[in-house]
Regions:
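Conserved Class I SAM-dependent methyltransferase catalytic core
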Residues: 111-123, 358-417
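Short, contiguous acidic/charged loop-to-helix segments that flank catalytic cores in large enzymes
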Residues: 23, 348, 358-371, 394-400, ...
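Extended hydrophobic-aromatic, low-complexity segments
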Residues: 315, 323-326, 332-339, 391-393, ...
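Conserved Class I S-adenosyl-L-methionine
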Residues: 91-99, 347-348, 400-421
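Nucleic-acid modification enzymes, centered on SAM-dependent nucleic-acid methyltransferases
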Residues: 1-52, 56-322, 329, 333-362, ...
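Active-site proximal loops enriched in glycine and acidic residues that flank catalytic Cys/His/Asp
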Residues: 306-309, 328, 394-396, 420-421, ...
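Short, basic/hydrophobic alpha-helical segments
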Residues: 34-41, 374-385, 660-674
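C-terminal non-catalytic scaffold/interaction domains in large multidomain proteins
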Residues: 415-745
């Protein structure tokens, strides 16, 4: 089978926050449904063998497919079942109100918990609740409180008062609270005990007391199972926010290790519960969901198997998936360990057993990850038709992650029959299908395979290419040529090391590649180009994408962003997948979006208007040449010559940022000055292109860039002379940073 370059499916990010989203692998809506529509008929059985996130199954079921999900993590099972139920906000409000009114001794639970966050507003002395507290890890205590005063409007960080410091320690003996929390996870003589004790360090005393108290109250409520699940899910938001993992100042936290940052936020956990109700993900309609062996209807739904795939397969006759979909997560010791802890707190020690390995293991490397993924894929390979397609989404991609996926898939007997990789989105989308045995090449042959794969992709793109994409290209070439162990019962302990060394030699010891960009000496970074020019006639990929977007905007008029992405990614699939940042930059440069997100070409960018602009450029250059006593010749490029015929300036007029056709075509060392003249609206795009393509940047080192408006200003100056021209030529740079005028002669 041959790998087919597939169009990258961009999808759409969620419009609102999702539960546990900082732990779950990133997911865009629309990707799974688009893939299923192409590969499988509606109503078909589809399998998610990992169940790493609830969203693929939900999307597939809403698209009319029957989805089988193997879910070994009870926390993710709960999340999937509750999101499928799509409870309205009023139900969430009702169960939270019932929890709030439950009693702790002689007071309402809500009042008791809120009293632990009580503080005084430093601005007006009103007694209010703090939004949270900022802890210092070294001092092992809170040092600031976060206030949004509902009385006077004060909103800031403030030092703690003496009363605030007293409330840090909750009622009762903290040692007893902590011991009881650990006991719900494991017994003292259990091999899981040390991991449970270590995980407890993620909760400060007040947070641990509150989560324990609230979970006890949930257990004491007489609720039907559906409402109890709602409370458990709300409690998850509290358990999540209650850890010490959330650094301060706030940033894009995606913790993977149980490591407390130097400063972290302790949130007001009752406020967290209230916010969870307000921010609950809204969905159009519930999804039919059941647990095995009960099955969903033909019109679509989800069947969850709460266990490992090996305990489930083979499936009975009549229930044979026609395809598989899954999001491959990166190893996440923090989430996996906390899932075991939360499962124990919510449901007791039995619920911890499926995740017991997470309390025993502290670190996960890529070799471990490859082995775990190989185990799952091998089970799937033995229990499904060879031609059954598997769609893998691999977000947060790094070289080691891709190596693990490639090694696992090959060793399980799968070939890549489709691929797309978006480098700046750090996401690969792979289609796997079972294949016949591939012969293993000799080591030197394998190195040549990888090098050829890298060079072919660079030539295909015809521009310096980021390492991540080339690393994947090397491994894909190895997999096609038998350079990765294929159809093996297990992955050898040194497989990834050997692959890394082989690919490393391609980049470190190759005379055919040169590296741009990163200051680091490691090869796994920067942008790579060919030591010898590619000789390709195609423009650089960035120019091709820019031209496609221009044509699209001219041809179609108003176009939604999603449609633009689909057209561009269809045109440039596989290794040609453009960066999302470049698509954004092109749209911002040429077009504007209305309130509905429809993009239209700006009036100034209409072809007729830009042709007129370039005609005016020629006229303005002629006016300037006359004032400077020079002779103008040619038409785009225009040349300025001295009376004796000596060429001193050559000007290139552009309405786009497609610089390569001029800059790369010129000799590097010339005796005259070269100037690109372009619209001011193209300045940011041209600057970004020079930043991305350092080969182009190097070649452009002696060039000048002149905006239309600046040329017009210079042409209108009555007192212009050669010295003044030389001083002002670079006074309005495309980078937007004013420069000191410099002399050219």
């Amino acid at each position: 089978m041959q790998t087919i370059a597939r169009a990258y499916l961009a999808g759409q990010p969620f419009s609102s926050p999702q539960l546990l989203e900082h732990f779950l692998p990133p997911y865009h809506e629309g990707v799974i449904s688009a893939w299923l529509k192409e590969y499988l008929p509606p109503g078909a059985w589809v399998l998610d063998p990992l169940g790493s996130t609830p969203f693929p199954a939900l999307e597939a079921a809403r698209s009319g497919y029957r989805v089988l999900v193997a879910s070994n993590n009870p926390i993710l099972t709960l999340l999937l079942e509750v999101l499928a139920a799509a409870p309205p906000e009023r139900e969430l409000q009702a169960v939270l109100a019932e929890l709030a009114s439950s009693r702790r001794l002689d007071e309402r639970l809500e009042i008791h918990v809120q009293s632990l966050y009580q503080t005084e507003c430093p601005a007006c002395n009103a007694r209010i609740q703090a939004d949270g507290f900022i802890w210092d890890r070294e001092q092992a205590k809170p040092v600031l409180k976060l206030i949004q005063c509902p009385v006077c409007g004060a909103q800031d960080e403030y030092p703690l008062s003496a009363a605030d410091e007293e409330r840090v320690t909750p009622p009762g003996r903290m040692e007893l609270h902590r011991a009881r929390a650990i006991e719900r996870i494991s017994s003292p003589d259990s091999p899981l005990h040390a991991g449970a004790v270590e995980a407890m360090q993620m909760y400060q005393p007040r947070a641990l007391y509150i989560v324990s108290t609230i979970i006890n109250r949930i257990e004491g409520l007489n609720l039907p199972e559906s409402r109890r699940k709602l409370l458990w899910t709300l409690a998850l938001t509290m358990l999540d926010a209650g850890t010490s993992l959330w650094g301060w100042p706030e940033e894009r936290n995606r913790p993977r290790q149980l490591s407390i940052p130097p400063r972290f936020r302790e949130s007001n956990l009752w406020m967290v519960l209230e916010q969870a109700v307000r921010n609950w993900p809204r969905s159009e309609k519930p999804v039919f969901i059941t647990r095995w062996p009960n099955l969903p209807p033909e019109e679509g739904g989800i069947c969850v198997f709460p266990g490992r795939l090996r305990e489930w397969l083979p499936l009975p006759r009549g229930i044979q998936p026609l395809g598989a979909i899954t999001v491959v997560p990166r190893p996440n010791q923090a989430f996996w360990t906390l899932s075991a802890v939360w499962a124990g707190w919510l449901w007791g020690r039995e619920a911890v057993l499926p995740l017991k390995g997470t309390l025993e293991r502290r670190r996960y490397d890529w070799q471990w990850h490859a082995g775990a993924l190989h185990h799952t894929l091998s089970i799937l390979r033995r229990n499904s038709a060879a031609e059954m397609p598997i769609f893998l989404i691999c977000p947060e991609l790094v070289p080691g992650f891709y190596s693990a996926v490639a090694a696992a898939a090959s060793a399980a007997g799968y070939l890549q029959t489709g691929q797309a990789l978006c480098a700046d989105a750090e996401t690969a989308q792979l289609v796997l299908q079972g294949g016949a045995d591939v012969p293993s090449p000799a080591s030197q042959v394998g190195e040549n395979l990888a090098r050829t794969g890298v060079e072919e992709v660079i030539k295909l793109r015809n521009e310096p290419t980021p390492y991540l994409l080339l690393h994947a290209a090397a491994l894909a070439a190895l997999a096609r040529g038998g350079g990765i162990p294929f159809n093996k019962p297990e992955i050898a302990w040194d497989t990834l090391t050997k692959l890394q060394n082989l690919v490393g030699r391609v980049f470190n010891k190759s005379e055919s590649l040169i590296r741009f960009g990163s200051q680091a000496q490691a090869s796994e970074s920067g942008w790579w180009w060919l030591a010898q020019e590619s000789g390709q006639d195609e423009p650089p990929l960035a120019d091709r994408v820019e031209m496609e977007i221009i044509r699209l905007l001219i041809r179609q008029g108003g176009t939604p962003r999603s449609e633009i992405e689909t057209i561009v990614y269809d045109k440039y699939p596989g290794w040609l997948t453009p960066d999302t940042a470049w698509l954004d930059a092109c749209l911002d440069s040429y077009a504007e979006a209305d309130e509905r997100g429809t993009w239209r070409l700006r009036q100034a960018e209409q072809p007729a208007n830009r042709r007129q602009d370039l005609l005016q450029v020629g006229e303005q250059l002629a006016v300037l040449a006359d004032k400077l006593g020079l002779v103008v010749q040619g038409e785009n490029p225009w040349e300025w010559r001295l009376k004796d015929g000596t060429l001193i300036f050559r000007f290139y007029g552009l309405a786009s940022s497609m610089l390569a056709r001029y800059i790369l075509a010129e000799e590097e060392e010339v005796e005259f000055q070269r100037v690109i003249i372009l619209p001011g609206s193209r300045a940011k795009l041209a600057t970004l292109k020079l930043h991305r393509d350092m080969r182009l940047q190097q070649m452009a080192a002696g060039w000048h860039f002149l905006k239309f408006r600046h040329l017009r200003t210079l042409a209108e100056r009555a007192n212009i002379n050669m010295d003044l021209w030389n001083m002002l030529l670079d006074a309005d740079p495309i980078s937007g940073d004013p420069q000191q005028p410099r002399m050219l002669f």
